[in-house]
C-alpha cells in the first residue's frame, strides 16, 4: 500500500512524528484511509440537508443572520475526493462563527470558568488554572458566545487554528483569543471536522488568512 509505505518512510527517514501525523490527517480528509460507501446519499443532497439544519438551529437559538461565504462558481478542487463527498466552506455548515468577549470582564474568586487560549493545551480543555466570572456575567456573555457540548473551539492567538471539540457538558465563557464554531452535530461529525481543521491542507489556508485578531 503506497500510503503505508510513505508513512513508514516519513517515520524511518526523518523520525518526524508531526509530519507522519500530518500525512495521516491529509489522507483521512481526502477519504483515502477507508473504503467509501458509494451507495450513500450523494454529496449535493447531504450538503442541502446540512445547510437546512444549520439555518433551522440558527433561527431556534435566535442567532443573528450574517452573510455567508460560499464556494465561487469557478472553484477548482485542489485534490480529488470520493464521489459521494463535496466541498463546502465553514460558513455553509456552521450556524454561528464567533469568538469570546473582546473586553476583560470582572473576575471572581469562584464561579463560572472563563477560558482563554492558554487553557487549550495538548489537545485538551484545561480547567486547572482558569479565571472565573460570576453567574450574572456568564449569562450576559453567553448571549453572544455560548459554548456548548459538540461545538468547536479554535485558537486565534499564539499558535492559531488549533481546534478542539467541546466533549464535556459544562458551563464556561470565552475570551477573544478563542473562536467558537457551532455546527448541526446530528448532520456533521464534530470530530471529523476537528481532524479536517487540523490537517496541513486547512492549516495552510489558516496561515495564509491570518492577519491579526481583535
Regions found by a protein language model. Give the residues of each.
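Cys/His-rich finger/ribbon microdomains and the adjacent scaffold used
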Residues: 42, 46-89
Amino acid at each position: 500500500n503506497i500510503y503505508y509505505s510513505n508513512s513508514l518512510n516519513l517515520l524511518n527517514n526523518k523520525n518526524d512524528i508531526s509530519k507522519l501525523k500530518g500525512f495521516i490527517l491529509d489522507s483521512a480528509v481526502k477519504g483515502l484511509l477507508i473504503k467509501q460507501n458509494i451507495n450513500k446519499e450523494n454529496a449535493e443532497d447531504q450538503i442541502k440537508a446540512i445547510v437546512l439544519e444549520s439555518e433551522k438551529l440558527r433561527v431556534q437559538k435566535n442567532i443573528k443572520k450574517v452573510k455567508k461565504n460560499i464556494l465561487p462558481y469557478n472553484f477548482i478542487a485542489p485534490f480529488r475526493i470520493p464521489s459521494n463527498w463535496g466541498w463546502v466552506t465553514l460558513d455553509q455548515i456552521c450556524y454561528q462563527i464567533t469568538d469570546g468577549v473582546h473586553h476583560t470582564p470582572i473576575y471572581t474568586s469562584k464561579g463560572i470558568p472563563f477560558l482563554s487560549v492558554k487553557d487549550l493545551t495538548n489537545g485538551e480543555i484545561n480547567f486547572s488554572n482558569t479565571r472565573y466570572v460570576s453567574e450574572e456575567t456568564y449569562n450576559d456573555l453567553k448571549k453572544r458566545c455560548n459554548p456548548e457540548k459538540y461545538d468547536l473551539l479554535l485558537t486565534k492567538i499564539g499558535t492559531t487554528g488549533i481546534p478542539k471539540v467541546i466533549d464535556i457538558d459544562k458551563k464556561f465563557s470565552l475570551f477573544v483569543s478563542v473562536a467558537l464554531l457551532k455546527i448541526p452535530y446530528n448532520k456533521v461529525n464534530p470530530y471529523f471536522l476537528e481532524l479536517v481543521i487540523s490537517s496541513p491542507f486547512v492549516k495552510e489556508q489558516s496561515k495564509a488568512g491570518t492577519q491579526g485578531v481583535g
